[in-house]
């Protein structure tokens, strides 16, 4: 059991009475509770694609994820999402990504650790920001742990660039990395399938590279209990 929504009453009582080394109960820091009680860690590798690097200037287009068992997940905006939030009011916050932001958060909540590349600086803060803007609940501090292959490269290796592409090329010998052009991003904003499909493939390739890079490098660094 790694999702509080699936917890039985007896388990919730145990979690409420538990105190971790941070001074929190198992309800506020469930990841600490799971670790202390020998619950097997479940890792979700993920990546997002968005209109802009800042969540107040762009929406999420799509996301892709894979767990350690090879289960694959994804979601992406559709023309229905775009039409649902169509407005001529200049003061309305764009919320076309509300559905896929929620589906990503729902998936993340089923795992006790997530991993991305520079996810500590981009994917997670962006998703959290979009969730708050879209009025969607985001997991509280201490709920889910995080790992980041960018941090591993930065602290344990000495490369000219700590990008996912460079890390994979130099340490693994290949990278699937491509680039999303401005025309593709604008196509995504219009809900055009050709653009969305290219963004989906780009995101999938990033996650495949991420998983390979994590497997090649994670043994060189202690797995910390840093919260999302």
Regions found by a protein language model. Give the residues of each.
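Generic beta-sheet signal
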Residues: 43-44, 112-114
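Two-metal-ion RNase H-like nuclease active-site motif
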Residues: 41-52, 203
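Metal-dependent phosphoesterase core characteristic of DEDDh/y 3'-5' exonuclease domains
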Residues: 58-68, 113-227
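N-terminal accessory regions of nucleic-acid-interacting proteins
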Residues: 1-42
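RNase H-like nuclease fold core
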Residues: 50, 54-85
